[in-house]
Amino acid sequence: MKKTWLRILTAALCLSLLCGCGAPAPSDTAGTAAPEEGYASAFTRLRFPEGAQPSLWALTDGGLYAASREKLADGEVPEGKTLDYEGQYDVMGWRLYHIGEDGAAAPLAYEPLPAPEDTEGRRGFSAEVGVEGLQSAPDGGLLVLESQTERWYTGEAANPERDPDYWDHVEYRSKYFLRTLEADGTERSCGTLALDGLEPYLYEITADAEGNLYLPAEGMLGVFAPDGSALACIALGDGWIYSLARLRDGRVALLLWQNGMRLFTVDAEQGELQELLALDSFPDRLYNGGGEFDLYRTEGTRLLGLRLEDGSEETVLDYLDCDLSPQELSLLAPVGDGSFCGVCSLEDGDVQRVALSRQPRTASERTELTLGTLSATTVGDAVLRFNRSQDRVRIRVRDYSDYVNGEDYEAGLTKLVTEILAGDMPDLLALDGLPYAQLAARGLLEDLDPWLDRDAELKREDLFANVLRSMEVGGRLYEVTPGFSIITMMGPSELVGDTPGWTYEEYEAAWAQMPEGSTPLGPGVNRDMILELCTYLNLERFVDWSSGKCDFEDPAFLQMLSFCAQFPDADSTYYDEGSSDMTRIAEGRQMLVFTSIYSMDDVVYNDQLFPGGSTYIGLPVDEGAGNILYPTSGFAMSAKCADKEGAWAFLRTFLTEEYQTKYSGYEVGLPLNRSAFRSALDKAMEIEYEKDAEGHYLLDANGERIPTSKGGMGVSTDGESVMEFQLWAMTQAQADKLLAVVENATRSVDRNGSVAAIVREGAAAYFAGQKSAEETAHLIQSRVNLYVNEQR
C-alpha cells in the first residue's frame, strides 16, 4: 500500500488480512487476495545477571549490545543514618553486555571513565559517570557517549541535607566523552566533546556510518567526530527535533518541526540541513534504513518503509499482527532479507529480543476474529494482551483511520458503517465514534445479557448495575466497558443542596440568590455546549431506537430549550484573562463549574474549588440526577460473529476486577467492577506522612504523625498568580460523595452525536428569535424522526 509523504494515506485497506503480520494488499475491493508472504515474530527472553537494568541498546555487525546501570557493590551506611529505601547507599555503576543467540547476556571488558574528584574544596561535593548513548560504530564496534557530572552545594546551611531550599543551592558541571570500543568492550579511542557551551539534549542521539555523533541541543544540532572535535553546529531556529535515524546510505536523517513536519538530512561538511520531504502526516518515530527502504518509521501500529527517490512509502508490517506494541520497542533495525531485529520490554518486566522475518502465508492454527476500530492505537494494548494469553483465538485489528484523508476526516467512519450495512461486519467493534444505538436497534449487535448471566465467574452484582443499564438499548445490553467517567456540574452545597440532582425550578431558585453581575458558569461556556450535553442527557427520553419513535414535542424538551437559551452563543463567549473559574467562584461571581470525574484524584482536587463544601449537582432535569456517564471505551460483538465464545472471552476481560485494578487510570477511568472501585478508593484514602531527611516520621505537638500531600498542581488564576491544588488523601466524606454520584447517575452519552447535531442545527433559529420553542420542537421532531428511521 503506497503513498507519498506529501499527502495522508487515502488508499483503502484490503479486507482480507494476512495471517502473519504483513501489510494488507493495496486494494479497496472486498475479497482481494492477500500477499503470499507475511511477517512472523519469534521472541527470545534476554537473561541478564540479577540486578542488571538494561536501558540502552545497539545492534552492530557483531550482534546485540546493551548498557545497564546496576549495583556494583554494597555501600556503607553512614553513621547515624537510616535507610529511606533498600539499596540507598549501594555503589552503582555501568556495565556493557553482549547478547548471545540464546538470549544470555555476557559482560564486556569495559570500564567506565573514572568519576572526577573535588580539587576545589566544594561543600557537599559528589560526582558520577553515566552512559548516555549507545550506537553502532564502523567495523562492528561500539560508540559510547559517557558523561561526567559534578554536583556541589553553594548554600549557607550548616547541614545541607536539612536545607529546605537545598535544590536551589546546587550547581552542576558536566563533560561528555565519545568512546569507540572494540566488539569485546576494550577501548579503541576516546575524545572529549568540544561542546563550546552547547547544552545537549540526550533524549535522541545517533551516529552516521563513519562513526560521527549527532547530538540535539536547544535550537541546535551538534555533529562530532570520533575524537570529540566539532564538525558542525547547525542552528535549527524554532525547530524541534523529534527523531533521528541513519539512512540506508549511511547519512543521518532528522524529523524536525519547522512550520510543519519536515524530514532533513545533515551535511556536516557544509554545516547545514538539506530538506528531503515536507510531511502532512506526523510520524511517531524514525528507524534506521536498510534492505529495500532508505528509512523506516512508525505511524500508529504500522511500520512503514520510505524510498527517497520518489517519496513513496509502503506498509511493511502491522505491529499488532506480530504480537508487538510499538511503545514496547527500545530498538528496531533491519538485518537483511527484509528481516528485522528488535528489543521490547513487556508489561511483566521481561525484556525480549524479537526477530521479524518474512514467511510464506499459512492458515492460522487459531480462530481469527476481526475487530473494527476508528483508532488502532486506542485498542492495541488490550488486543495485544489478549492475543498473548490465548492459544485458541486470535484477534486481528481493522483500523479504519487508515481511510482518513485531509479532505474527509469522517472517511474512516463512513467506510466502516458502509461495510457493516453491506453485511461485511467485523466480529468485534470498538464503539468510540460509532452509532452504537442504531447498530443495536438494527439487530447487528449481539445481546450480551445471556453471556454475562452464563459467565461462571462474573456476576451482575459485581458491577455497577446503573452503569450497565445506562448503556442498554431497548432494555438489552450490547456493550461492555472497563470503566467510565462522569460529566457534571458542581456547586456550593449551601446554595445547591447536598444531594445530586435538581429540577429546572430548583436551578432557577438557586440562581436567583446570586448577586447581580454573576454568571451561572464560566465565560467560555456557550449555549451549544449546554444544548449538546442536555441532549445527551435526555436522548433516551426523546428517541426510542428500537421502535423508531421520537418525541421532541414533549414539554420537557421545551423546558430544556428555555434553559439553554439563557447562555451566550458561541460568538459571544470570551476568555476572561483576568479571572479563572477558581477566582470567580472564590469572589462569588460564578455559581457553578463544569467538571468531570475520571479518577479518584479528581474528587480531591475538585473539592478545593469550594472550601465550604460542594455537591456534584449535575445539569437540571425534570427527574433524577443530571450527571452523565461516559464509558471509557466500549466494545461490542457482531450478532453474526464467527466465534462468539472466543469473542466473549475477549469482552469479559474488561469486566474483571483484575483488569480494572491492573490497568486503572487512562485505560479504565472509574472502575465498573465494584471490587476494583473499592480498591481504588482504599488506595486514594491511604494517608502519607511527613518524614525528615533521615527517613523518620515527623510528629506534631501532640506526638501524632503529620499528614502530607501526595502531590499537587498549580493553576494560573489570572495569567500571573497561581492557585495551588494539593492531592491529599481522600476522606470518607469524599468517598461517600463520589459513590453517591456514581450510583445516582443513570444516563450515558451518545458517542456518535448525530442526533445532537440535528438538534443543535434546528435550535439555532429559536435562539436567534426567529422561531418559537413549539415551532422549533416540531421541526426537530420531523428531522430526527426521519434520520432515526433511516438508520433502523
Predicted feature locations:
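Extracytoplasmic/periplasmic solute-binding protein
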Residues: 476-487, 506-565, 579, 587-592
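Surface-exposed loop and turn segments in beta-propeller and other repeat-based domains
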Residues: 104-127, 188-198, 319-324, 403-404
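Glycine-centered hinge/linker elements that transmit conformational signals in sensory
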Residues: 547-579, 601-608, 614-620
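Conserved N-terminal structural module of periplasmic/extracytoplasmic solute-binding proteins
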Residues: 22-87, 97-99, 103, 148, ...
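Long, aromatic- and glycine/proline-rich binding clefts that accommodate carbohydrate-like moieties
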Residues: 666-761, 765
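Extracytoplasmic/periplasmic substrate-recognition and gating elements
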Residues: 607-691, 705, 744
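Short, solvent-exposed loop/beta-turn-alpha elements that line the ligand-binding surface or hinge
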Residues: 449-462, 540-561, 618-628, 769
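Hinge/lid segment of periplasmic solute-binding proteins
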Residues: 434-488, 505-506, 613-620
